[in-house]
């Protein structure tokens, strides 16, 4: 899109947002143009907290469907819009509610800690929700004699098992972006840029995490890079975060690792996140849809597990 078109659309979006008393929340994995127009940018935990405290009449969530669902669960009387309702999540899709409910029935005595990257229905069948930045803190509060069932990300679960020295029952889900990085490409890049810090999201497989200098949530990765100006960084997460990293560390250099199939680094963009565009954002503010709606019973059940997260963090 031409710069002049971006400016024009951005102006219209700001006008519509003010006119409708709307707040625009955007995840770090959104396109830079959307990040720049948002009222608030953050990771899943930060966006959840912002959704819980907003006084706006309308919440426009520039992220994926499960994130907009969380905003609706927290604010059942507010209108929640998602620029593209098809913006799903491969990780959330890897754990369907029917199978998860049966899985829970097989492990009735377990405490179910579910990653926020999950559907409202799965959250409804869970005890506690967590994010990548809050998971360790939550797990450490569970009594040692209680078995934990962790879903849906097996790589995040494995990372947390090592961090907490706590064996858990793991659901075998994965994120299509974080499991796609090539270890060979990473090692080659580390050789070429031997002074670079390797920063990884814990949704990455262990063969990538073991090469990393720092592992954390998107916000934690952002903080790490901001505290080390004029440095080099190899990034093992969705490349949308680099837009904010460059803003906070303009003198630093950031590298993106290619994918397993040898494809271009642009394959590390989440295709679901990128379904949201400035044009769709403008249209949803103008028309008041697509709107996220939820079954009341499911929403109330899911809110209990989200409230447990907020209480423990």
Curated annotation (Swiss-Prot):
Q: Which GO terms describe its molecular function?
A: 4 iron, 4 sulfur cluster binding; metal ion binding; quinolinate synthetase A activity
Gene3D superfamilies noted in UniProt: NadA-like
Where located? Answer: Cytoplasm
Name the cofactor(s).
[4Fe-4S] cluster
Q: What does the entry give for GO biological process?
A: 'de novo' NAD biosynthetic process from L-aspartate
Which pathway does the database say it acts in? Cofactor biosynthesis; NAD(+) biosynthesis; quinolinate from iminoaspartate: step 1/1
Keywords in UniProt for this one? 4Fe-4S, Cytoplasm, Iron, Iron-sulfur, Metal-binding, Pyridine nucleotide biosynthesis, Transferase
Give the record's cofactor note, including how many are bound: Binds 1 [4Fe-4S] cluster per subunit.
Pfam families, alphabetized:
NadA
Q: What is its main location?
A: cytoplasm
Q: Which GO terms describe its cellular component?
A: cytosol
The set of disulfide-linked cysteines is none
Name the job this protein performs.
Answer: Catalyzes the condensation of iminoaspartate with dihydroxyacetone phosphate to form quinolinate.
What the record says about family reads: Belongs to the quinolinate synthase family. Type 2 subfamily.
What is the official name of this protein in its record? Quinolinate synthase
The gene coding this protein: nadA
């Amino acid at each position: 899109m031409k710069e002049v078109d971006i400016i024009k659309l951005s102006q219209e979006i700001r006008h519509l947002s003010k006119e409708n008393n709307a707040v625009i929340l955007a995840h770090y994995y959104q396109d830079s143009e959307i990040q720049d127009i948002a009222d608030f940018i953050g990771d899943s935990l930060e966006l959840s907290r912002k959704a819980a405290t907003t006084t706006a009449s309308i919440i426009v969530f520039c992220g994926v469907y499960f994130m907009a669902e969380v905003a609706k669960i927290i604010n059942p009387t507010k209108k929640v819009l998602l620029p593209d309702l098809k913006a799903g999540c491969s990780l959330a899709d890897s754990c369907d509610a029917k199978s998860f409910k049966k899985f829970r029935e097989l492990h009735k005595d377990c405490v179910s800690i579910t990653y926020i990257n999950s559907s409202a229905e799965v959250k409804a069948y869970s005890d506690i929700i967590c994010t990548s930045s809050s998971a360790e803190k939550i797990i450490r509060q569970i009594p040692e004699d209680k078995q934990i069932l962790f879903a849906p990300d097996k790589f995040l679960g494995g990372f947390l098992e090592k961090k907490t020295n706590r064996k858990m029952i793991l659901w075998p889900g994965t994120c299509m972006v974080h499991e796609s990085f090539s270890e060979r490409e990473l090692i080659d890049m580390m050789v070429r840029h031997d002074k670079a810090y390797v920063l990884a999201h814990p949704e990455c497989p262990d063969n990538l995490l073991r090469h990393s200098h720092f592992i954390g949530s998107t916000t934690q990765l952002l903080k790490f890079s901001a505290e080390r100006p004029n440095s080099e960084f190899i990034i093992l997460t969705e490349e949308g975060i680099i837009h904010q990293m460059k803003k906070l560390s303009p003198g630093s250099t950031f590298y993106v690792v290619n994918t397993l199939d040898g494809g271009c680094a642009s394959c590390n963009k989440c295709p679901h996140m990128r379904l949201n565009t400035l044009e769709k954002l403008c249209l949803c503010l103008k028309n008041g849809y697509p709107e996220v709606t939820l079954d009341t019973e499911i929403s109330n059940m899911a809110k209990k597990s989200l409230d447990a997260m907020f209480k423990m963090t």
